[in-house]
A protein has these predicted regions:
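Short, positionally conserved secondary-structure boundary motifs
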Residues: 1-77, 138-142, 150-159
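Acidic/glycine-rich C-terminal interaction modules and beta/coil loop segments
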Residues: 54-159
């Protein structure tokens, strides 16, 4: 599915011409990503504006809608997180991560001596880190979709 997502992003971005003088280009929104328990990512073929400065810096980026409160200190529920596809992890940065074959979540990723921790960044103390240990074979079910590089709220977002 992720190859389809990234392939679609390339097709959409080929139609965008940042040098045209417009302040905004467009990137696809591929559905929701959990800020809580991992949920299935559903593909939604919509496009939404993004500042050209970001589009030039992250030409393969796409949006995922954040659903949940586990990252509410930095990503409000309902916002669009701009994801830059990558498989490399910078310790402590925020990533969209696939858990299993089609479930995904957005969390702060910490490298541990024995594995990886997916940490919430929430005002709600009931959200806890998920630790995946190298020895348990759990890391085989994790893959990085991309790093969160920016976010915006939809036009119809209610405060």
């Amino acid at each position: 599915m992720y190859s389809q997502v990234l392939g679609y992003a390339r097709r959409v971005l080929q139609q965008v011409h940042p040098e045209s003088g417009s302040l905004f280009g467009f990137v696809p929104l591929y559905g929701s990503i959990a800020a809580g328990a991992p949920i299935e990512m559903l593909q939604i073929e919509e496009i939404h504006p993004v500042p050209n400065a970001l589009l030039l810096r992250y030409p393969k980026a796409f949006y995922l809608r954040v659903k949940g409160e586990s990252m509410n200190r930095i990503l409000p529920n309902g916002c669009y997180a701009l994801i830059c596809p990558t498989s490399e992890v910078v310790d402590g940065s925020v990533y969209a991560v696939s858990v299993g074959s089609s479930n995904a979540t957005v969390k702060r990723v910490r490298k541990l001596n024995n594995g990886i921790a997916l940490e919430p960044d929430s005002n709600d103390p009931t959200y806890k880190s998920q630790v995946f240990d190298y020895g348990d074979g759990e890391l085989e079910t994790l893959s990085v979709i991309g790093r969160v590089v920016w976010f915006c709220v939809p036009y119809d977002y209610e405060i």
